[in-house]
């Protein structure tokens, strides 16, 4: 859920992770800055190391909340809306006007991100990021016996 929210904010709404990260962090009961920031950056696609993850909010809602029980609990205005309508976002007349078309905005983000990744310097820059910040196995040092 966290990954999808960050992905949607970054790709579909094209918001900078630095602004959305603190808003999301406020909702966590298990907030750990060292984990949160790196995950936010990864889900926002700014590291260049990981493949972009642009989630389908429709697929995620169907997979994670097939009966829409959680969605209806979080958004009480949807309590009497049919589950099928909730999962395909046909809510314009029932709840609110969409601020972005999820399918079109995901396609635009995907096209934009992949165009950037095709840049001739992308791999070089991504490698530099990895060498500076990427996770690596720690070397095992043999302890001298006393």
Question: What spans do the regions from the language model cover?
Answer:
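C-terminal catalytic domain of photolyase/cryptochrome flavoproteins
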Residues: 1-146
């Amino acid at each position: 859920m966290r990954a999808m929210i960050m992905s949607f904010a970054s790709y579909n709404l094209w918001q900078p992770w630095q602004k959305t990260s603190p808003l999301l962090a406020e909702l966590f009961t298990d907030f750990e800055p060292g984990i949160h920031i790196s995950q936010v950056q990864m889900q926002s696609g700014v590291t260049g190391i990981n493949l972009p993850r642009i989630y389908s909010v429709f697929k995620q809602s169907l997979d994670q909340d097939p009966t829409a029980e959680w969605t209806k609990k979080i958004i009480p205005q949807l309590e009497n809306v049919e589950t099928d309508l909730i999962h395909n976002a046909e809510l314009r007349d029932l709840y609110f006007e969409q601020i972005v078309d999820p399918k079109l905005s995901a396609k635009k983000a995907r096209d934009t991100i992949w165009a950037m990744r095709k840049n001739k310097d992308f791999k070089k820059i991504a490698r530099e990021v990895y060498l500076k910040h990427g996770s690596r196995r720690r070397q095992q040092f043999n302890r001298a016996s006393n």
